[in-house]
């Protein structure tokens, strides 16, 4: 899980080794939720980066999530390039046999992702992980950490 052995019942607290494990892994990392729930849909938090290219390749090659409804969300700064890349990603997923619903959300990615997960009862989130340096993370914060804190569903992270 994401809270670690010593987390107790402190809400929103992440385990002390979680970031280190994710940063060190060359494979996708699955972070389980506290309780099991049936997964009927998933959200791909798409930012157009290299980690999302790996996520798209994973989804095309693996049958793990095939048959589930895909919410493809682009959150943050939305411009023509972002929209084009998102639609190209949707086409790749459709070519791989996924039913895809595309959503563009200007503004805070962490909030947009958490809101969509809650509103659509999404069962698992796929996202990139720690794409910036630790120094930038200390100053600005980490989208990855906030997603892990605010989404109470399993998360599959790609580096």
What function would you assign to each model-found segment?
Residues 14, 55, 109-110, 140:
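Amphipathic coiled-coil/heptad-repeat helices and related helical stalk/stem segments
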Residues 5-6, 37, 50, 78, ...:
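Surface-exposed, flexible loop/turn segments at secondary-structure boundaries
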Residues 44-48, 79, 83-86, 113-117, ...:
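Short amphipathic alpha-helical patches
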Residues 66-136:
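Glycine/small-residue-rich hydrophobic helix-like segments
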């Amino acid at each position: 899980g994401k809270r670690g052995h010593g987390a107790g019942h402190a809400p929103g607290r992440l385990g002390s080794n979680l970031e280190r494990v994710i940063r060190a892994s060359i494979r996708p990392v699955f972070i389980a939720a506290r309780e099991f729930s049936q997964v009927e849909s998933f959200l791909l938090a798409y930012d157009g980066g290299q980690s999302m290219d790996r996520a798209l390749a994973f989804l095309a090659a693996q049958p793990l999530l095939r048959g589930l409804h895909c919410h493809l969300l682009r959150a943050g700064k939305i411009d023509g390039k972002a929209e084009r890349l998102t639609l190209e990603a949707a086409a790749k997923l459709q070519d791989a046999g996924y039913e895809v619903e595309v959503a563009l959300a200007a503004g805070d990615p962490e909030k947009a992702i958490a809101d969509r997960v809650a509103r659509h009862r999404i069962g698992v989130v796929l996202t990139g992980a720690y794409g910036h340096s630790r120094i930038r993370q200390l100053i600005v914060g980490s989208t990855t950490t906030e997603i892990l804190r605010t989404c109470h569903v399993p998360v599959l992270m790609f580096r």
